[in-house]
Every structure is written in C-alpha cells, then in structure tokens.
UniProtKB/Swiss-Prot annotation:
The organism's taxonomic lineage, starting at the top: Bacteria, Bacillati, Actinomycetota, Actinomycetes, Kitasatosporales
The protein's name in its UniProt record: NADH-quinone oxidoreductase subunit B 1
Amino acids binding [4Fe-4S] cluster: 37-38, 103, 132
A molecular function (GO) term: 4 iron, 4 sulfur cluster binding
GO cellular component: plasma membrane; respiratory chain complex I
Catalytic reactions on record: a quinone + NADH + 5 H(+)(in) = a quinol + NAD(+) + 4 H(+)(out)
Self-association and partners: NDH-1 is composed of 14 different subunits. Subunits NuoB, C, D, E, F, and G constitute the peripheral sector of the complex.
Organism, as annotated: Streptomyces avermitilis (strain ATCC 31267 / DSM 46492 / JCM 5070 / NBRC 14893 / NCIMB 12804 / NRRL 8165 / MA-4680)
Length: 184
C-alpha cells in the first residue's frame, strides 16, 4: 500500500530542482582549455570511437560565452593563469570545471615556480581526473560523475551561495605541495 498504488498511472512526483538538473545534465556544452598532452586525449574522447555526443556534448565550444563546462587539460603556467581565469569569468552561470590530468590537478612533475600547482588556486574545480595523461574512458567517467553532480545541484539563491563559497575556497587555497628538490 505504497504511494505508487494511490496515484493514477502517468503521474510523476519531483521537485523543480530535480527536473532542472535532469535537463541540464543532458545539455552540457564543453569549452576546451587544452594545454599539453591531456588535450590529445580530450580530443580523442570527442572523436567517433568514444563519441561524446551520446552524453549531450555534440561539439566543443570555441567561445566561453557558449559553454558551461571547462575542461582544463594539462599544465597551467603562471602566465596562462590570468587567461584561464578570464575564460572562466566569461562563461555563463551555472558553470563547471573538470581538472584533467595530474598536471592540472597538482602541477604534476613540474614542481617549479613557472607552473601553477593546481588549477583549484585559480578557479573552483568540480571534478579532479587523475592520470598522466588520463585515458578517454576516464574522462567519460568523470563526465558521468559530473552529470550526477549537476542533477543534484541547487537553484536560485542556494546555487549563488554555493558558488560564492566555492569561489572563496579556490582563492584562499594554500599550495598543495612544498617546492623542494633540485631548484631549492
């Protein structure tokens, strides 16, 4: 004697946030920010063998104003960091970021002054994807995990507050590793 038996068939009970999340996850438009080896794997993911179109990502967008997902693939130099931030700021809300590869996530093997030790110091990151470089299957798995996160995301004032908190955390983040080794 559950709720399903009391309602006539053809009815669906949900919330506005769940319905909007279901629609949003099926129409994510990625912008590429490929900087190194990981960019090759990201391009492979969009090709015929892996076919990102089945997840609602027909084409990588050339303009950040048409995208709501930024895939940062590869190492980010100190000179490239302001450009990365500018591209992120030009994206419309809601926006998400995948940090693809160990170089984007933590600086990787480039432990020196010229490379940002994790893009989470510049933009808030939603999904971290490990690997050097990660395989296309791993990127697809990260996109599916992002779909789950998008489907459960908040709307309105709650979304603005969550975005503001993530932004502040990204700007206050401490370096992930201490620079040691041959250079110090």
């Amino acid at each position: 004697m559950g709720l399903e038996e009391k309602l006539p068939s053809g009815f669906l009970l949900t919330t506005v946030e769940q319905a909007a999340g279901w629609v949003r996850k099926a129409s994510v438009f990625p912008a590429t920010f490929g900087l190194a080896c990981c960019a090759i794997e990201m391009m492979t993911t969009g090709a015929g063998r892996y076919d990102l179109a089945r997840f609602g990502m027909e084409v990588f967008r050339g303009s950040p104003r048409q995208a709501d997902l930024m895939i940062v693939a590869g190492r980010v130099s100190q000179k490239m960091a302001p450009v990365l931030r500018q591209v992120y700021d030009q994206m419309p809300n809601p926006k998400w970021v995948i940090s693809m590869g160990v170089c984007a996530s933590s600086g990787g093997m480039f432990n020196n002054y010229a490379i940002v030790q994790g893009v989470d110091h510049i933009v808030p990151v939603d999904i971290y994807l490990p690997g050097c470089p990660p395989r296309p299957e791993m990127l697809i798995d990260a996109i599916l995990k992002l779909h789950q996160k998008i489907q459960s995301s908040k709307l309105g004032v709650n979304a603005e507050e969550a975005a503001r908190e993530a932004e502040e955390a990204a700007l206050k983040a401490l370096p992930t590793i201490e620079m040691k080794g041959l250079l110090r």
